[in-house]
């Protein structure tokens, strides 16, 4: 994210700044501390989508100066269909519930209702019990491995992946390389000049390699850079260097 461009878009009407920590397509890590500082000077709250970073690096919400943080269960090696929102208590106290149902009320009258204490006022009805238990276990699993260990290992994998991809002719990689953005995600988004990314994904699938192809939920980004679609390969702490070699061999 370009800081000067961000400054130009902040106005007195900006109530909330909502942005990604790490791009799921470009892989770049945004300068959140600087953005939060500018937003606070403007009187704006900051909402951080950390789905792409929570399982890959330590995040200190106090240090970043943010007001909200959103996370996703399945991107933390947990179940699908569950996520979470962190915020400061004083902010959550002011926010009205957005779902109605059992357990989130204190008193109900014909014309009005009062709400239960936090966090219950945001947990209407029967919660996703099994998913919540699974998410907690996934978080424990990641913490036992250690986020510092995970980040160090994934940085080495990312550097190796970019090195091997750059050996392939007619490939264009989208996003900053590891030497430019050392905190970038352990992924690579690219396209080959002589084949559509969807066709590439099908060919690799037939060879036992699963990648993502298309817009990656980022159609405006693809239009901005003038590309119809891209291919993306993603790694995490379970990926081995030998698997990168196999992927590159099949890609060639």
Named regions from a protein language model:
Residues 1-252:
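Pyridoxal 5′-phosphate
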């Amino acid at each position: 994210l370009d800081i000067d461009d961000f400054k130009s878009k902040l106005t007195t009407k900006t109530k909330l700044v909502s942005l990604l920590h790490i791009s799921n397509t470009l892989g770049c890590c945004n300068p959140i501390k600087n953005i939060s500082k500018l937003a606070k000077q403007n009187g704006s709250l900051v909402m951080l989508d950390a789905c792409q970073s929570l399982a890959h690096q330590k995040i200190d919400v106090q240090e970043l100066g943010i007001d909200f943080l959103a996370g996703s269960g399945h991107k933390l090696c947990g179940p699908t269909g569950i996520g979470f929102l962190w915020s400061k208590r004083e902010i959550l106290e002011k926010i009205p519930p957005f779902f109605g149902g059992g357990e989130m009320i204190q008193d109900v009258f014909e014309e009005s209702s009062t709400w239960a204490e936090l966090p219950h006022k945001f947990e209407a009805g029967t919660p996703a019990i099994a998913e919540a238990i699974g998410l907690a276990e996934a978080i424990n699993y990641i913490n036992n491995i250690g986020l510092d260990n995970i980040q160090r290992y994934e940085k080495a994998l990312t550097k190796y992946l970019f090195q091997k991809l750059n050996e392939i002719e007619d490939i264009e990689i989208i996003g900053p390389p590891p030497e430019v953005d050392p905190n970038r995600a352990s992924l690579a988004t690219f396209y080959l000049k002589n084949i559509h990314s969807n066709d590439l994904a099908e060919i690799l699938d037939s060879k036992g390699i699963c990648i993502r192809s298309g817009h990656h939920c980022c159609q405006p980004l693809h239009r901005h850079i003038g590309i119809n679609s891209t291919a993306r390969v993603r790694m995490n702490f379970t990926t081995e260097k030998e698997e990168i070699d196999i992927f590159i061999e099949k890609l060639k």
